[in-house]
Each structure stands twice: as structure tokens, then as C-alpha cells.
Amino acid sequence: MSKTRVIYPGTFDPITNGHVDLVTRASRMFDEVVVAIAIGHHKKPLFSLEERVKLAQLSLSHLHNVEFVGFDGLLVNFFREQNATAVLRGLRAVSDFEYEFQLANMNRQLDHHFEAVFLTPSEQYSFISSTLVREIARLRGDVAKFVPQAVVEAFEYKHQQGW
């Protein structure tokens, strides 16, 4: 039987406890989980690709069937390159579903092997987003409840650098 391989794509700017929750749960469902960190040119990320990969690695080091890859370009092409079984997406709200449903169907039009798997977050993480976390951190609020310790320290470093 072939191994199951799921891709969890995102910009992860920064990785949050909600992301960690989804990857942890996916690691029990799939043989291999690829955390695919998008370069995200259009989003102008706070953290560089290298920083985001490192923060994800530090935050998920307890999981042994997870790998971390930076990527650019179409997700469906990356899906093929990785010989993936499916793509994992988190759904926090109905508005997420509408967008993800459209995206999954578009990707399936590009490659009929494309499959999307949707997970809802654990209740305590359902409201967390990287955007909200960045805004709280920018205003020097306490984000320790929302992100792994490595991210808290990365924000502290950004503040020391004048952010």
C-alpha cells in the first residue's frame, strides 16, 4: 500500500497554535505531512521565507512525519511535484468554506487527481488568524496564548529591531 502524503499550504506569517493543531491532527491521519510555506509575494510577509520555515520547524519539531518546504507558484503544480494524496485546508468559518470550495474545484479542473481535505480547528483555536496575531503583536499586545513560544520570541526580536 502506498503512503499517504498531504500538503498543508499557507504563508504561515506567522505560524499559530491553530496551524500547529491542524498539523498535529493531520500527522495522525496521513503518513507524511508537508508544511508548504508559500513565498507570498502578494502578501508582503513580515517574516522572511527562511524565518517562517524555521518558526514552523521549531513549532512542530515534536512531529516526526512532518517536513517543511518553501514553494512558489501554483499549488496544483506543487501538488503534482510532491506526488501528494491531498491538500489540507483549515476552515474556521463559513466564509472560509466558500473560498476553499471554489479553490478546490478550480484546482480539480487543472488536475483531476487534485483532492482537498478540510479540517475545522479545535474550538479554542477557531478565532486565531496570522493577520490578527500580527496586528496584536505590532501594537505590543501579548500573543503568547495564540502562537508557539518561538514566535513570541521572534516578535520580541522584531520589536528590538524597530518594528
Curated annotation (Swiss-Prot):
User: Which residues participate in ATP binding?
Assistant: 11-12, 19, 90-92, 100, 125-131
Q: Tell me which Gene3D superfamilies the record gives.
A: HUPs (3.40.50.620)
Which classification does the entry list for the species?
Bacteria, Pseudomonadati, Pseudomonadota, Gammaproteobacteria, Moraxellales
Q: What is this protein called?
A: Phosphopantetheine adenylyltransferase
GO BP terms: namely: coenzyme A biosynthetic process
Q: How does it assemble?
A: Homohexamer.
**Protein species of origin:** Acinetobacter baylyi (strain ATCC 33305 / BD413 / ADP1)
The EC number(s) this enzyme carries: 2.7.7.3
What exactly does this protein do?
A: Reversibly transfers an adenylyl group from ATP to 4'-phosphopantetheine, yielding dephospho-CoA (dPCoA) and pyrophosphate.
Where in or outside the cell it occurs: the entry states:
Cytoplasm
Which Pfam family, any one of them, does this sequence belong to?
A: CTP_transf_like
Q: What gene is this protein a product of?
A: coaD
Q: In which pathway does it act?
A: Cofactor biosynthesis; coenzyme A biosynthesis; CoA from (R)-pantothenate: step 4/5
- List UniProt keywords, sorted A-Z: ATP-binding, Coenzyme A biosynthesis, Cytoplasm, Magnesium, Nucleotide-binding, Nucleotidyltransferase, Transferase
Q: Which InterPro entries match?
A: Cyt_trans-like (IPR004821), PPAT (IPR001980), Rossmann-like_a/b/a_fold (IPR014729)
The UniProt entry's GO CC annotations, sorted and at most eight, read:
cytoplasm
Question: What one GO molecular function would you report for this record?
Answer: ATP binding
